[in-house]
UniProtKB/Swiss-Prot annotation:
Keyword set, alphabetical order: Cytoplasm, Glycolysis, NAD, Oxidoreductase, Phosphoprotein
EC nos: 1.2.1.12
Gene name in the database record: Gapdhs
Functional summary from the UniProt entry: May play an important role in regulating the switch between different pathways for energy production during spermiogenesis and in the spermatozoon. Required for sperm motility and male fertility.
Knockout consequences: Mice display greatly reduced ATP levels in sperm, severely impaired sperm motility and are infertile.
Name assigned to this protein: Glyceraldehyde-3-phosphate dehydrogenase, testis-specific
UniProt note: domains: The testis-specific N-terminal extension mediates tight association with the cytoskeletal fibrous sheath of the spermatozoa flagellum, possibly via interchain disulfide-bonding of Cys-33 with sheath components.
Major enzyme class: oxidoreductase
Record field: compositional bias (Pro residues): 40-75, 83-102
Amino acid sequence: MSRRDVVLTNVTVVQLRRDRCPCPCPCPCPCPCPVIRPPPPKLEDPPPTVEEQPPPPPPPPPPPPPPPPPPPPQIEPDKFEEAPPPPPPPPPPPPPPPPPLQKPARELTVGINGFGRIGRLVLRVCMEKGIRVVAVNDPFIDPEYMVYMFKYDSTHGRYKGNVEHKNGQLVVDNLEINTYQCKDPKEIPWSSIGNPYVVECTGVYLSIEAASAHISSGARRVVVTAPSPDAPMFVMGVNEKDYNPGSMTIVSNASCTTNCLAPLAKVIHENFGIVEGLMTTVHSYTATQKTVDGPSKKDWRGGRGAHQNIIPSSTGAAKAVGKVIPELKGKLTGMAFRVPTPNVSVVDLTCRLAKPASYSAITEAVKAAAKGPLAGILAYTEDQVVSTDFNGNPHSSIFDAKAGIALNDNFVKLVAWYDNEYGYSNRVVDLLRYMFSREK
């Protein structure tokens, strides 16, 4: 290479260096910075021929430094795979065996058909005893009138709780009770409200066939609050243990008078034996009687004014005792006097005894039963009482020791009081609870 070529080559190199100016100025043009030209190399041997090449492209920008690696997770020494696993904890002691599964008890729910004297008092007693009433049916009473009739009672006083109606329901102490106005029991939707036990209080559907309409519409059981011509009859404290839940869906709670007489007759017969007897009930007037004289084709005397007269009447209460105490079948009969009092009646049982006994021995036997097996059903008093003293008494029968008399040790007259409304309604509810207990 000639000296001229060497010079040209150096010029080219200098030009390339100027293109890559080391100064910090951002301009791409040749900058005014002074160029330091290196001295020409010493030529010992002629350099090889160098062909002129285009300037190389600028080097790519260096890649951004990689992000620092995340710090290794802080692992407990015993979590390293290399570390041996800790010994397993000892197994816990076996749990105690679970209690045997019990079928949950179905709650006793009650429906009432007929919101008359007994229907309303059955509702009161259910509220007092914590039994849930789910429905009341009465074709002649709407919910607003039900509130009035239940809240105010001329005989038993005003209901002490809260009573109102809301959305077509009767609400008693915040308990919502469905109300219906169905004339036919088959139309009452018992099945849609939990298949309750139904209390038949109308006095109309007394036979098994008639009361079966409630079963057809979903009632679980039916208790008729009157003597029935063919349904099994039960008096609490006397024969309720004969109830058979497998075959008896419709039963009768007998009459209020039978509920008074039967417990007393049971005690006397078991202790002394009853050869025969006559019963008279002096009975308060009821809703079937007339306030003033009126027509009564089947019972002419019964059509006379209830407030003005003592009215002789028939009753099947004494004969019904033979149904609940079979040993007394055919040994008792009786009659009634309807008198001008609104509530509380009294039974006079005059009987001949098989086993001679003094009157004091008889009273002691009744007193022992009232404190023992018949507690809550039969009561005993020696006080000088009158009828109004028993208004609101929940017992079926209250024996009046001072009112009875004996002709001799085999012939006696025994007296027992009863609230023919409230006492009877308590036994209706007791029978419902007993029947329900037999289903468990």
